[in-house]
């Protein structure tokens, strides 16, 4: 874990350095009409995908393993939320570890949006399980909240079938979500756990709507699943702040799961040292 954390931290630092370099380059080349050498990610495809279910336009970032075109193998698949910031980091770190035989090659799919400038609106709409008029990013964005069920149906009924028809994907699937994205992952675990068989849930916003999902978990009779499912909960050690007791909330959710019958479901709980809500994702 410490080695992986160090690699993620390095990747995060490089991302910040690159962002600063790009900002400087824009300032010093304001007269240039275009850049002739643009940065791109190898083995990565992009696709616009319009959902018929929630009528939202998504951008998919799809990373294929290096040897994908030269063999007939089927691969595990990883689904990333908040792909506009998570995809490049996860792809580069995964390839680094795969090249050293530390992890298996995987297809990585990042779910992003046609208009990244509407970041707060998009994730408030898609990742939250209920309508709440205030809180979160504020009432300006909360008026779009409560679209988690429609987002689930988009993933389950449209996105997953498309990817399985288009690429050589096996049955090993992983969900990755942070903050509101982690909240959506917990929502899936409670209401639709069959979608994925691995979950990496980082600092989920379990406080949302007066701890709505925690209450739903407490009402659930059991967490018995049809397929073996493994969940990794990750949170920073600086995430109990003021009214937001995010470490306590996540510990409670894990305890609720483990206190009920939970056939085929196992969990891992990690608290990362010297991490807060903003810095924990690269270390996850």
Regions found by a protein language model. Name each.
Residues 18-75:
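A domain-start/cap signature at the N-terminus of enzymes
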Residues 113, 200-208, 238:
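Active-site nucleophile loop of the alpha/beta-hydrolase fold
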Residues 167-178, 199:
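Alpha/beta-hydrolase fold nucleophile elbow
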Residues 177-181, 185:
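Gly/Ala-rich beta-loop-alpha elbow adjacent to hydrolase catalytic centers
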Residues 187-197:
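Conserved hydrolase catalytic core segment
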Residues 234, 242-284:
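C-terminal catalytic histidine-bearing segment of alpha/beta-hydrolase fold enzymes
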């Amino acid at each position: 874990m410490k080695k992986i954390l160090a690699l993620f931290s390095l990747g995060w630092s490089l991302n910040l350095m690159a962002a600063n370099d790009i900002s400087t380059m824009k300032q010093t080349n304001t007269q240039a009409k275009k850049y002739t050498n643009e940065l791109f990610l190898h083995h990565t495809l992009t696709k616009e995908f319009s959902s018929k279910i929630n009528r939202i336009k998504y951008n998919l970032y799809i990373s294929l393993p290096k040897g994908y075109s030269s063999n007939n193998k089927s691969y595990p698949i990883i689904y990333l939320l908040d792909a506009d910031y998570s995809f490049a980091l996860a792809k580069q770190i995964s390839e680094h570890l795969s090249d050293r035989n530390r992890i298996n090659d995987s297809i990585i799919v990042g779910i992003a949006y046609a208009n990244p400038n509407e970041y707060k609106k998009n994730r408030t709409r898609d990742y939250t399980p209920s309508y709440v008029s205030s809180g979160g990013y504020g009432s300006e964005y909360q008026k779009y909240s409560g679209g988690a069920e429609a987002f689930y149906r988009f993933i389950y009924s449209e996105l997953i079938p498309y990817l399985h028809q288009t690429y050589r994907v096996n049955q090993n699937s992983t969900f990755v979500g942070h903050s509101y994205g982690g909240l959506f992952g917990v929502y899936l675990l409670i209401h639709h756990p069959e979608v994925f068989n691995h979950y990496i849930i980082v600092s989920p916003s379990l406080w949302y709507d007066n701890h709505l999902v925690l209450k739903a978990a407490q009402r659930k009779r059991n967490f018995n699943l049809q397929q073996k499912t493994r969940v990794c909960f990750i949170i920073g050690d600086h995430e109990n702040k003021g009214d937001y007791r995010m470490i306590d909330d996540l510990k409670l959710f894990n305890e609720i799961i483990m206190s009920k019958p939970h056939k085929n479901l196992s969990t891992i709980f990690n608290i990362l040292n010297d991490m807060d809500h903003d810095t924990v994702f690269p270390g996850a």
